[in-house]
């Protein structure tokens, strides 16, 4: 299944706020109307929708998300918590959380077009897994800095998660540590996502 490129508002109306996909929010009461319209949801549908929230927020294909679930399942600790850490530490998501891009698709475009450096080297792989002490900067070119400045000027200036530091005048972000689960940028029940995949195998 390919990455979603359809109408974004249609997705948030059904699944709720997806800040990584779009800065728009569903209208008040739309979740309740959806529930009334669809009647009682089955447990399968509840797990499916939670999985879809995760997939659309982080902009992943079905195959990519399944790969992350399998990696998380082999790691020590809670599979759900490890899964969220893996997704949150992706380079495209780190740029989004720093405010250097307004959405994760926008961050992915910056990376693909080679505007971003990690530790002084160009990285053009959005899924690059950031590590503590990584330094994320833009290229010195005027176009690269203008793009980032535009995003920084229009960002909502929300409190940064504790694992990140932004030096906006230097167009630089620092990864201080692996993210703590309470700073994940999406309201999600990750256990339902893990359950969804465990029942598919």
Curated annotation (Swiss-Prot):
SMART domains reported for this sequence: Ribosomal_S4, S4
Name recorded for this polypeptide: Small ribosomal subunit protein uS4c
Family to which the UniProt record says this protein belongs: Belongs to the universal ribosomal protein uS4 family.
Keywords: Chloroplast, Plastid, Ribonucleoprotein, Ribosomal protein, RNA-binding, rRNA-binding
UniProt domain S4 RNA-binding: residue ranges: 89-149
Function: One of the primary rRNA binding proteins, it binds directly to 16S rRNA where it nucleates assembly of the body of the 30S subunit. With S5 and S12 plays an important role in translational accuracy.
Organism: Platanus occidentalis
Superkingdom to which the source organism belongs: Eukaryota
Quaternary state and interactors: Part of the 30S ribosomal subunit. Contacts protein S5. The interaction surface between S4 and S5 is involved in control of translational fidelity.
Molecular function via GO: rRNA binding; structural constituent of ribosome
Chloroplast listed as a keyword: yes
Major localisation: plastid
GO BP: ribosomal small subunit biogenesis; translation
SUPFAM superfamilies membership: Alpha-L RNA-binding motif
Entry's localization field: Plastid, Chloroplast
Region annotation (Disordered) ranges: 19-38
């Amino acid at each position: 299944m390919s990455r979603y490129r359809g109408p974004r508002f249609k997705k948030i109306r059904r699944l709720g706020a997806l800040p990584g996909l779009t800065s728009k929010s569903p209208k008040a009461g739309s979740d309740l109307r959806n529930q009334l319209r669809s009647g009682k949801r089955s447990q399968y549908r509840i797990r499916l929708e939670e999985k879809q929230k995760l997939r659309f927020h982080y902009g992943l294909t079905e195959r990519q998300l399944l790969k992350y679930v399998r990696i998380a399942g082999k790691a020590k600790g809670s599979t759900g918590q490890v899964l969220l850490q893996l997704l949150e530490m992706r380079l495209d998501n780190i740029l989004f959380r720093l405010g250097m891009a307004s959405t994760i698709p926008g961050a992915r475009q910056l990376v693909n077009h080679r505007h971003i450096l990690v530790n002084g080297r160009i990285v053009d792989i959005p899924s690059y897994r950031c590590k503590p002490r990584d330094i994320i900067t833009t290229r010195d070119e005027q176009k690269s800095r203008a793009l980032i400045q535009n995003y920084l000027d229009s960002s909502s200036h929300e409190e940064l998660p504790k694992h990140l530091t932004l030096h906006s005048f230097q167009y630089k972000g620092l990864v201080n540590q692996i993210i703590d689960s309470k700073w994940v940028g999406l309201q999600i029940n990750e256990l339902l996502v893990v359950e969804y995949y465990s029942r598919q195998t």
